[in-house]
Amino acid sequence: MNDLPWLSLLMVVPLTGAAVVAVLPSSSAALARPIALGSALVTLVLGIIATATSFTRGSTEQFQMVEQHEWIPQLGVSYSLGVDGISLALILMALVLVPVCILAAWDDAPEGGAWHKGYFALLLVLLPFMIGVFAATDVFLFYVFFEAMLIPVYF
């Protein structure tokens, strides 16, 4: 299980949930909340499993769960992710806070309100970008994730 691309998987799950929430028809807008919460909780569970199976506590100063793929070789830019002790703590904090935010907004509007789909979809889009910011080991990739993170925050 240590060969799984855990960090990329943690980014794909909420993006998939966001896509499902975004394409819900207006008549099913009430499903946005449970789908968003389910997606966030699945991501949290995957984060806990990844930490338990792939992170060695004795070497928190080294990058672990490393994924590296060439992206723009002419510029020396790569899709490079990894976590150390601090970045893992920040990722786990984000994974806990997103379900809390979803639960906090659970009753803020009438059932099936028009803003539910957009709010929950954008919150789920924000999560993988936060994970990317905390896990990026390439400065260009960090910049891309940080700037991408600002888009759902703006709306």
Regions inferred by a protein language model and the residue ranges of each:
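Hydrophobic core positions of alpha-helical segments in small-molecule transporters
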Residues: L9, V13, I35-G38, A121-L122, ...
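Alpha-helical transmembrane segments of multipass membrane proteins
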Residues: A18-V23, I48, P99-I102, P128-G132, ...
